[in-house]
Amino acid sequence: MKKYKIIYADPPWRYARSKVQGAAEKHYPTMSIEELCALPVKEIADKDCILFLWATFPQLKEALQLIKAWGFTYKSVAFVWLKQNRKSPTWFYGLGFWTRGNAEICLLATKGHPKRQSNKVHQFIISPVEQHSKKPDITREKILALMGDLPRIELFARQHTPGWDVWGNEIKSDKRFAGKEV
């Protein structure tokens, strides 16, 4: 099985409050934390690998649990996406659970000793929201600038990106992973 030095993932988190407006379940199938933890990500991670994992603040505890289950150690927040509205440069605000949410975070975790290639990559991503849960394309560019042109895969991918292997239920996957095309 091919090993990757970069794993980029935007899991389809299942929320306890699935009836709220904008709930992920209305847009795509979600997975429980147990289902996510059971994915054999350890099998595709190189001995020196970096994981970029999108998480929302209500799922932060589960994201840290998932990082550990996949064999990684949490290090930092790689990126903070400050969301703008689609049609104007004003800030986008979701309903939120307590306060009106805007930012989403991409956590950084490592296995072994991956090496950073650049110290010039900034944490903030200021970009409009697009389709539900789609992350800014510039994230992949920032990952490559930070880590270099290494073997990489995007889990739960929605699109094909040159140079990236992909796995997800919304696209034709390149590989087999967890008994499914990847």
How would you label these PLM feature ranges?
Residues M1-V182:
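Class I S-adenosyl-L-methionine-dependent methyltransferase catalytic core
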